[in-house]
């Protein structure tokens, strides 16, 4: 038997030699490598996982990353990169220094407790900025003008509500009464019942059944992570070693974070270039036996465009996969509008979970969101460790253990105070303002005024609170930069370049908001069109342009250093940020000065 096999192999090798005798060596090597790669693509899970995850990066990005991986090992390259990055980040350090100038900062907790007056003085700067946030502002109130003067009327999606003074005082009392309670324990039955009430209210808003399950979380990112973790854990329990989360390319970055934290693979699906929404037929081609969940946005953060939830629900049912609707941004806006013709919640068969932020259009204190699961959801976000030596340990949610009951109580108080009718009034006023802005822009472009729809236009067909702007003749980031000079603080977008304006209740209180915005937008576009050829970008525009030509590793390092600077107050001092630990830097003068308990930045 072995002799027969040996003869067969010898004959096969001989035939292969004859077949390839005139073939150049490099072709044989490349062909062998290609066959080996293709084999592993389908039969080696680790290679398949690497390939599918890498496939999410553009070819341009992969080339940049590969070139950097080779170049960074060359002598002196790290030092050059370090030097250039510090030049680019110098403006960030300067902004931090200016923001914190005049603040009295401490190195340690005080030895003796401070008086309430001394403690409150530490908040003076931010309290002054929020002073008018706590007034009862009506359409005829003179305080409306202050919103513009303080810049609140020109921030995109930063301040979602202006609480009446009465509600602010109520929230103070509620927090003081409940700050030390903990919903994880049954010692506070009213807090526990209140949490169940809040979750039930939200389930009803999104048309869930009484058997729905829900969590009150710290924010949209947490809600998304809870849902994704539940589905990934379920997939692994089914024997799927490398679960995949399939999302539109416009899905929030929190899904990428969730994939990295759970060890799942994030599969991004291209959206339609005209509509900005994902095509269910295209998404279908990305679903495999490893798919843990598919995702749709309602709406997306970038351009405020919602994916076709009903069609995606049908796809989920057909493919027998869970379907998560991310309504973190607009959930508590659309819930109070008539969406019966195009539902985006549990009315859609196939929807198994929804994430929605209370701290946006729900007007609740920051750090509040919900993650809801349908009655038919195959997975729930629950954690249990029943063999722990400390006893039975179980939490409603995978991430949180103990939390303050004040969060529950403040959400309960806010929702109760506003009521459905007020939320409906707010939602309608925001949509009315969005329509007014679009009408003003249409009128501007029809009248000419030196501009056409090629110079500035709203992308897609947004129906809710976000307007995404692009230009075919100008750098959209330059336009946003000019608007910033006029006091506007907008969100820059990339791939492709653009910017968006996220409307909130605050904007509806600013008299003539739409007229002022379109006036400034027109001036900004005209200024950019008159830029001299070859004008170099600066500020945020320069940062966004550089990121597009930067390796992923450096992008993450810059973000890490920026966040480190924000969270470590000493980083506001002049000095070099260290990217590579083996690169020597000069001693930071600020470090030498931190010898006393207090100092001025």
Swiss-Prot record:
Cofactor(s) the protein needs: pyridoxal 5'-phosphate
Catalytic reaction equation(s): sphinganine 1-phosphate = hexadecanal + phosphoethanolamine
One biological process term in Gene Ontology: sphingolipid catabolic process
EC identifiers of the protein: 4.1.2.27
A molecular-function term among this protein's GO annotations: sphinganine-1-phosphate aldolase activity
Family to which this protein belongs: Belongs to the group II decarboxylase family. Sphingosine-1-phosphate lyase subfamily.
PANTHER family assigned to the protein according to its UniProt record, in alphabetical order: PTHR42735, SPHINGOSINE-1-PHOSPHATE LYASE 1
Descriptive protein name: Probable sphingosine-1-phosphate lyase
Species for this entry: Legionella pneumophila subsp. pneumophila (strain Philadelphia 1 / ATCC 33152 / DSM 7513)
């Amino acid at each position: 038997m072995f002799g027969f096999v040996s003869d067969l192999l010898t004959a096969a090798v001989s035939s292969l030699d004859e077949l390839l005798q005139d073939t150049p060596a490099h072709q044989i090597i490349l062909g062998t490598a290609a066959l080996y790669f293709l084999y592993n693509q389908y039969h080696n899970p680790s290679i398949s996982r690497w390939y599918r995850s890498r496939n999410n990066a553009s070819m341009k990005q992969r080339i940049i990353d590969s070139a950097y991986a080779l170049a960074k090992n060359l002598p002196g390259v790290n030092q050059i990169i370090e030097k250039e990055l510090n030049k680019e980040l110098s403006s960030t350090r300067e902004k931090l220094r200016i923001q914190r100038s005049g603040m009295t900062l401490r190195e340690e907790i005080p030895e003796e407790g401070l008086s309430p007056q001394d403690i409150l003085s530490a908040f003076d700067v931010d309290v002054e900025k929020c002073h008018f946030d706590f007034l009862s502002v009506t359409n005829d109130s003179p305080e409306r003008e202050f919103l513009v003067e303080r810049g609140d009327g020109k921030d995109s999606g930063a301040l979602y509500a202006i609480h009446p003074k009465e509600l602010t005082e109520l929230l103070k009392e509620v927090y003081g009464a409940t700050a030390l309670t903990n919903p994880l324990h049954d010692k506070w039955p009213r807090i526990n019942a209140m949490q169940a009430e809040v979750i039930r209210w939200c389930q009803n808003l999104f048309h869930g059944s009484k058997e729905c399950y829900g969590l009150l979380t710290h924010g949209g990112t947490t809600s998304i992570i809870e849902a994704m973790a539940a589905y990934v854990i379920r997939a692994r329990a089914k024997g799927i070693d490398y679960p995949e989360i399939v999302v539109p390319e416009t899905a929030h970055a929190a899904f990428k974070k969730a994939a990295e934290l759970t060890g799942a693979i994030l599969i991004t699906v291209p959206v339609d270039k005209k509509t900005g929404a994902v095509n269910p037929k295209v998404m279908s081609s990305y679903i495999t036996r490893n798919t843990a969940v598919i995702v749709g946005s309602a709406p997306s953060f970038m351009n405020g465009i919602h994916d076709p939830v009903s069609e995606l629900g049908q796809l989920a049912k057909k493919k027998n996969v869970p379907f998560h609707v991310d309504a973190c941004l607009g959930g508590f806006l659309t819930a109070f509008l008539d969406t019966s013709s195009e539902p985006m919640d549990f009315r859609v068969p196939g929807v198994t979970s929804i994430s929605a932020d209370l701290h946006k259009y729900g007007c609740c204190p920051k750090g509040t969101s919900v993650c809801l699961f349908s009655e038919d959801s195959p997975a729930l976000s629950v954690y249990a460790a029943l063999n722990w030596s400390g006893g039975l340990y179980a939490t409603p949610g995978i991430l949180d253990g103990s939390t303050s009951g004040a969060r529950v109580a403040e959400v309960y108080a806010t929702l109760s105070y506003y009521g459905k009718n007020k939320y409906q009034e707010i939602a309608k006023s925001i949509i009315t303002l969005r329509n007014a802005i679009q009408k003003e822009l249409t009128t501007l472009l029809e009248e000419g005024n030196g501009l056409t729809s090629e110079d500035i236009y709203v992308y897609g067909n947004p129906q809710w609170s976000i307007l995404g702007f692009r230009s075919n003749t100008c750098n959209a980031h330059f336009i946003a930069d000019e608007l910033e000079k006029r006091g506007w603080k907008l969100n820059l977008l990339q791939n492709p370049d653009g910017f968006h304006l996220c409307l909130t209740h605050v904007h509806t209180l600013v008299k003539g908001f739409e007229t002022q915005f379109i006036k400034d937008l027109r001036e900004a576009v005209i200024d950019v069109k008159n830029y001299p050829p070859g004008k170099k970008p600066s500020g945020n525009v320069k940062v966004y342009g550089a990121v597009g030509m930067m390796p992923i590793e450096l992008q993450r390092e810059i973000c890490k250093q920026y966040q480190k600077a924000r969270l470590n107050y000493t980083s506001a001092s002049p000095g070099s940020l260290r990217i590579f630990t083996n690169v020597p830097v000069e001693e930071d003068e600020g470090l030498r000065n931190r010898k006393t308990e207090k100092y001025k930045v």
